Amino acid sequence: MLAALLGGAGARTGTLPGALLCLMALLQLLCSAPRGSGLAHGRRLICWQALLQCQGEPDCSYAYSQYAEACAPVLAQRGGADAPGPAGAFPASAASSPRWRCPSHCISALIQLNHTRRGPALEDCDCAQDEHCRSTKRAIEPCLPRTSSVGPGAGAGSVMGCTEARRRCDRDSRCNLALSRYLAYCGKLFNGLRCTDECRAVIEDMLAVPKAALLNDCVCDGLERPICESVKENMARLCFGPDASNGPGSSGSDGGLDDYYDEEYDDEQRAGAAGGEQPLDDDDGLARPGGGAAAAGGRGDLPHGPGRRSSSSGSGGHWANRSAWTPFACLLLLLLLLLGSHL
């Protein structure tokens, strides 16, 4: 076939440029991967092509190696980390478990990989006929940092990412108001402390708002995915789970922690009122006289400058005794002068 393509030995010189042009055209078709071909669908790359392009970019190659290292324990469970695409992935059985979640450091590595130039193509690449690649993408799907509807061809019944759900809520006045009330009344829920009656009522009101209900059913994604998952877990456990009515402070005011800090502050005030610590003078750094009386609720005279002391302190009495000797010294001096004049 090659001899026929080249036109025989006697005509090689004249037909060689034409053969090269045919080969170059074939390579161009293979590399461009037009729509409908076996190498790509639209602008999506085959996963092995996306991986080669990532390896050719220093930032993407480094992020890919960091991803493989961060997700190594999960990849080892699957036993196939050599798959093309966004690295050999997570066990499908574990990913489908409701109690399983991606490690936070692995999610962070995925986010960093997505921030490179060639990284997003690894997520959106086409596996073609590679079944191993398809199983890898299915397994890693719950860990991808999506910011829109989950899945490339998400339909009306698909699950939405929480980032997109938050955008839609911000554009809706009713949902935005409900979200503001949720942030105001559910502070202890975010910290995993309690779900108050007020917070539970706000959540129930939110579920009646169509756009706000999307926030309850969405899948955590994006940069805030670990925080989102923690809040959802706390809400399911403290507001509607077995711990909803058990444990301290599961209902009532949302200021329980504030009450604790107020009580601690009152104890410090009572300790200071006992005169255990003397206030410092503003000028020389010495203990201010009368400070204990002032802390205990008395008047407590303050000094009017450096070196001055109140008459209520011991040092004040010392200064009063020295001033009392001044008239006696004058009398003695006068007597000595009189005696000297008579002599």
From Swiss-Prot:
Which residues are glycosylated according to the annotation? 114, 321
Q: Does the keyword Cell membrane apply?
A: yes
Tell me where in or outside the cell this protein is found. Cell membrane
Q: What does this protein do?
A: Specific growth arrest protein involved in growth suppression. Blocks entry to S phase. Prevents cycling of normal and transformed cells. Binds 20(S)-hydroxycholesterol (20(S)-OHC).
Which InterPro entries does the UniProt record give?
A: GAS1, GDNF/GAS1
Q: Which residues form the propeptide?
A: 316-343
Q: Per the record's keyword annotation, is Signal included, yes or no?
A: yes
Q: Where is the signal peptide?
A: 1-38
Q: Where is this region: Disordered?
A: 268-317
Q: Which organism is it from?
A: Mus musculus (Mouse)
Q: Where is the composition biased (Gly residues)?
A: 288-300
Q: Name one GO biological process term.
A: cerebellum morphogenesis
The protein here is known as Growth arrest-specific protein 1
Q: Chief subcellular site?
A: membrane
Q: Where is the composition biased (Low complexity)?
A: 303-313
Keyword terms of this UniProt record = Cell cycle, Cell membrane, Glycoprotein, GPI-anchor, Growth arrest, Lipoprotein, Membrane, Signal
One GO cellular component from the entry? Answer: membrane
Membrane topology, from the record? Lipid-anchor; GPI-anchor
GO molecular function terms listed in the Swiss-Prot or TrEMBL record: oxysterol binding
Q: Where is the lipid attached (GPI-anchor amidated serine)?
A: 315
